[in-house]
Curated annotation (Swiss-Prot):
Pfam families: LRR_8
Record protein name field: Plant intracellular Ras-group-related LRR protein 6
Region (Disordered): 1-57
Disulfide-bonded cysteines: none
LRR repeat ranges, renumbered to this chain: 59-82, 83-105, 107-129, 130-152, 154-176, 177-199, 201-222, 223-247, 248-271, 273-293
Family: Belongs to the SHOC2 family.
Organism whose genome encodes this protein: Arabidopsis thaliana
Biased composition (Polar residues): 9-23
Length: 380
């Protein structure tokens, strides 16, 4: 078992040190680099909630540990029982690895944030985090996930934006059935595993800014999906599967800045769809005079075509397109305005290139990893 092996990798002297520290904590809690700054004399403090009793029928205090932005290159020895930590923030440091022995002992961890570090691989013992609900590993150098991540069956949000991922585990969708939000934008993914269509709890899938060449065929199995963003795969993504129109709960679909020439006729069946973004594609069907109209007109055109009819195009109006690269195509299904929070942080039509942020003028002021990896997971 990975968890047991990782635990026994600890040097004996460190185990004795941990036992001594835990005994001290029975009498008084001491501040340390890995302890919460809250005082034991204030049990109502928001950083020290009481937890339900554990198997030993003793109430223990669950801790929120924040070591963000401390320029850490390695982790200090903990001075409290690691099983007491429920939220751990190690973001914005210089960490290159996460010790196997650390994750193996974080038995009650529900949120782990290591974004904006230099981590190249996650430990295999990540699979020991059976209670983990939120994992933010964005802004690192990950090429792949360990297969053991499939054992994090409580996981609800996974943020792996701004890495170097070239693939996801083949079985990731078979095990992470509680996953509600998957953010994997700004990587090097060529395809998504077929098992991803088994994520029946998934509500948000953000796979923009990759190298996706194809999407899985059985997308209709994502019965709760509300937001799908596969934009800005540029010359790689040239077609959408017809099953995309069977996503009956989809509200927002962004396929902008790809190489798509034909929209599937099944999109006409998407009655809950309120926003469709297709700008930056060399679309041929529907024709430009249809795409210049509202979403309802586009839906009716595709429905008529699917039913074998001969859809009539609206009278041609002034084009917003430039050559074959169409700039039209973001349709709102209603008059309601969508604020940035409701868009889940996606890059919408007001997209601007982040290349300019690399200029000397902005050196040290902005980091794309930090800009697109907001620390929102540790609000209580």
């Amino acid at each position: 078992m990975i968890c047991e092996e990782a635990y026994h990798q600890q040097p004996q002297i460190q185990k004795e040190q941990m036992m001594t520290m835990d005994q001290r904590n029975n009498h008084q809690r001491k501040r340390s680099p890995l302890s919460s700054p809250s005082s034991p004399s204030s049990p109502s403090s928001p950083s020290s909630p009481k937890s339900p009793s554990f198997n030993n029928n003793e109430e223990e205090r669950l801790e929120v540990v924040n070591l963000s932005g401390m320029a850490l290159e390695s982790l200090p020895n903990p001075s409290l029982n690691l099983a007491q930590i429920c939220k751990l923030d190690l973001s914005n440091n210089h960490l290159q690895t996460i010790p196997e022995s650390l994750t193996a002992r974080l038995l009650n961890l529900i949120a782990l944030d290591v974004h904006s570090n230099q981590i190249k691989a996650l430990p295999n013992s990540i699979g020991c985090l059976s209670k983990l609900k939120t994992l933010n590993v964005s802004g690192n150098f990950l090429v792949s996930f360990p297969k053991s991540i499939q054992h994090c069956r409580s996981l609800e949000e996974l943020n792996a934006n701004f890495n170097k991922l070239i693939r996801l585990p083949d079985s990731i969708g078979f095990e992470l059935t509680n996953l509600r939000k998957l953010s994997i934008n700004s990587n090097k993914l060529i395809s998504l595993p077929i098992s991803i269509t088994h994520l029946t709890s998934l509500r948000v899938l953000d796979a923009r800014l990759n190298c996706l060449m194809i999407l899985p065929d059985d997308l209709e199995n994502l019965i709760n999906l509300e937001i799908l963003n596969v934009s800005q795969n540029f010359q790689y993504l040239s077609a959408l599967p017809s099953s995309i129109g069977l996503l009956m709960n989809l509200i927002e679909l962004d396929v902008s800045y790809n190489k798509i020439t034909v929209l599937p006729e099944s999109i006409g069946c998407m009655r809950r769809l309120r926003k469709l973004s297709v700008e930056g594609n060399p679309l041929v069907s529907p024709p430009i005079e249809v795409m210049e109209q509202n979403l309802q007109v586009v839906r009716e055109y595709l429905t008529q075509k699917m039913n074998g009819g001969s859809p009539r195009s609206p009278s041609k109006k002034k084009s917003w397109g430039f050559g074959k690269l169409v700039k039209y195509g973001t349709f709102n299904g209603g008059s309601r305005s969508w604020n940035r929070e409701e868009r889940e942080g996606f890059i919408m039509p007001e997209y601007r290139s982040i290349d300019s942020l690399a200029s000397p003028r902005y050196s040290g002021m902005f980091s794309p990893r930090r800009l697109f990896s907001p620390r929102t997971y540790f609000s209580r």
